[in-house]
């Protein structure tokens, strides 16, 4: 059993039902972001699953220098604050530097540490010192048991509000693979584990100047992860993935979410009997 973490009105871990972290890869504009959040809230309320809304204000590690990165921190946080106020949903976004920690913590319910930055001690400590919930994505280059050291850096600051996310491991060039053993190994730290089902099917840099993806495998890996006992699922979604400004090839179409979430909820209920 993992520790129960409270994010706004959402509880993750501790034997609680499966939670969902979902939203667009990047904030494209205010209207689209609010529309996506409203749609997700409606879907989750209909299925009966708790939602934490996610969206990045800056995609700092895009493949190409010309790729769309987002509106930036100030405008992005303003939009996320509006989503939070309008819908009453907890919000999550990535932080990339120590300078971003304080302003982000003023708005966000969850500070997310990107996978490429998961070993950056100063960033982890600065985030931990806010007292906020910290979601750390396991680096594609890390073994699952190495996350205990990441946990130690955060908990050494007195912050036990920790969530860990599996997002696949590098498998040769331009590919990722998911080792299902990582879920019980990471949960053995005592903290909830989330599966990032959409980044795990990403093909990093696979399109030359952008990343590819195989969204057709999202459902299969999600079902397997829930059966393996994860505490939550992370998915990037879009109304029209083909038109998305970031990570369209591995984003789930919003229209497909109700049926998928119903399946995942049913599997979770069996696992937690």
Swiss-Prot record:
Keywords: Cytoplasm, Lipopolysaccharide biosynthesis, Transferase. Its EC number is 2.5.1.55. Gene3D superfamilies: Aldolase class I. It is found in: Cytoplasm. One of its GO terms (biological process) is keto-3-deoxy-D-manno-octulosonic acid biosynthetic process. GO terms for cellular component: cytoplasm. One of its GO terms (molecular function) is 3-deoxy-8-phosphooctulonate synthase activity. It catalyses: D-arabinose 5-phosphate + phosphoenolpyruvate + H2O = 3-deoxy-alpha-D-manno-2-octulosonate-8-phosphate + phosphate. Pfam families: DAHP_synth_1 (PF00793). Pathway: Carbohydrate biosynthesis; 3-deoxy-D-manno-octulosonate biosynthesis; 3-deoxy-D-manno-octulosonate from D-ribulose 5-phosphate: step 2/3; Bacterial outer membrane biogenesis; lipopolysaccharide biosynthesis. It comes from the Bacteria. InterPro entries: Aldolase_TIM (IPR013785), DAHP1/KDSA (IPR006218), KDO8P_synthase (IPR006269). Belongs to the KdsA family. NCBIfam families: KDO8P_synth, PRK05198.1. This is 2-dehydro-3-deoxyphosphooctonate aldolase. It comes from Geobacter sp. (strain M21). The gene is kdsA.
């Amino acid at each position: 059993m993992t520790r129960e973490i409270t994010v706004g009105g959402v509880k993750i871990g501790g034997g609680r039902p499966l939670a969902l972290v979902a939203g667009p890869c990047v904030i494209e504009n205010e209207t689209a972001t609010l529309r996506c959040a409203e749609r997700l809230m409606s879907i989750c309320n209909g299925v009966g699953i708790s939602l934490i809304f996610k969206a990045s204000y800056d995609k700092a590690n895009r493949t190409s220098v010309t790729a769309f990165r987002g509106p930036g921190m100030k405008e992005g946080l303003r939009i996320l604050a509006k989503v939070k106020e309008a819908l009453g949903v907890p919000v999550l976004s990535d932080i990339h530097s120590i300078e971003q920690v304080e302003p982000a913590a003023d708005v966000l319910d969850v500070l997310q540490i990107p996978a490429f930055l998961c070993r950056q001690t100063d960033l982890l400590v600065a985030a931990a010192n806010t007292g906020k919930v910290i979601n750390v994505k396991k680096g594609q280059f890390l073994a699952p048991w190495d996350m205990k050291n990441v946990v130690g850096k955060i908990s050494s600051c007195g912050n036990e509000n920790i969530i860990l996310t599996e997002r696949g491991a590098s498998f040769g060039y331009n590919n990722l693979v998911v080792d299902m053993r990582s879920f019980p190994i990471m949960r053995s730290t005592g903290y909830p584990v989330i599966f990032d089902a959409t980044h795990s099917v990403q093909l990093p840099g696979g399109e030359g100047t952008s990343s590819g993806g195989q969204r057709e495998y999202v459902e299969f890996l999600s079902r397997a992860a829930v059966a393996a006992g994860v505490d939550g699922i992370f998915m990037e979604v879009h109304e029209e993935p083909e038109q998305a400004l970031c990570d369209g090839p591995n984003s789930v179409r919003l229209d497909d979410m109700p049926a998928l979430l119903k399946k995942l909820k049913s599997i979770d209920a069996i696992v937690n009997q």
